[in-house]
């Protein structure tokens, strides 16, 4: 995979870890903005975008852009303590940067790009470890409105059905749930414990980017821990017509 890195200061030094990777690192200067760097990276056929640290509002905007259109996925670091805090912080950054004006719209865009949150902690002994792996599950908006008022004969019945639709509308407008989250992996008493399975959509996306060896190991992991058994897609075979199939069309004329 080709790595495309955007940083405010060079500190990742990934070429020491991945010397054989195609890596392009860029940082903003006084004359070249970070947005210009990101626009250039979109045209360089990158597979993974890495944002060094989302510490300012403009950098949060870069992260959202790169996660939506520029690569297979985006990695970034943030200092939020909980997953809801992460969503709120990124949403507020998008609003302050002027990218969005509405809180719900900004939050909806944020949760669409947050697939997994790998939360690291450092205890008082100086030990650093992964505390949890959390999956973000966007909640799709469903059309729950009905036309039952047409079936009502009386005005009171029609008004009651109308108020039901109005209640649904105001609930979606004022208190709509945009996402759910659940821990996939947790660190408990010195051991890592699998708590919830990965959603079907993310499993499918992950399998589509694996080679045969990784796919076998991943499928075995799913079946062993969560009882999820998946069948690999069969190779496409073009069907050949069976022998003796009658041809459509007019019958040939008989000659005497």
Say what each PLM segment does.
Residues 132-256:
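NTP-binding/hydrolysis catalytic cores, primarily Walker-type P-loop NTPases
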Residues 107-144:
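Phosphate-binding/switch region of NTP-binding enzymes
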Residues 1-111:
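Switch/coupling sub-region of P-loop NTPases
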């Amino acid at each position: 995979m080709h790595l495309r890195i955007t940083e405010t200061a060079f500190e990742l030094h990934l070429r020491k870890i991945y010397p054989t990777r195609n890596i392009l690192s860029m940082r903003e200067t006084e004359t070249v903005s970070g947005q210009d760097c990101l626009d250039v990276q979109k045209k360089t056929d990158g597979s993974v975008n890495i944002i060094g640290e989302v510490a300012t509002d403009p950098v949060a905007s870069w992260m959202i852009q790169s996660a939506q259109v520029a690569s297979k996925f985006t990695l970034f670091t943030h200092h939020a303590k909980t997953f809801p805090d992460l969503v709120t912080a990124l949403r507020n950054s998008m609003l302050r940067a002027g990218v969005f004006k509405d809180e719900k719209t900004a939050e909806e865009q944020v949760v669409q790009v947050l697939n997994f949150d790998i939360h690291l902690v450092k205890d008082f002994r100086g030990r650093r470890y992964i505390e949890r792996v959390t999956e973000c599950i966007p909640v799709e908006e469903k059309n729950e409105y009905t036309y039952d008022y047409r079936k009502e004969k009386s005005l009171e019945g029609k008004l009651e059905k109308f108020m039901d639709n109005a209640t649904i509308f105001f609930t979606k407008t004022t208190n709509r749930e945009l996402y759910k989250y659940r821990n996939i992996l947790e660190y408990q008493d010195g051991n890592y414990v699998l708590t919830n399975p990965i959603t079907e959509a993310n499993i499918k996306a992950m399998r589509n980017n694996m080679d045969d060896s990784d796919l076998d190991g991943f499928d075995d992991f799913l079946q062993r821990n969560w009882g999820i058994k998946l069948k690999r897609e069969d190779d496409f075979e073009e069907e050949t017509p069976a022998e003796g199939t009658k041809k459509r069309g007019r019958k040939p004329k008989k000659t005497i």
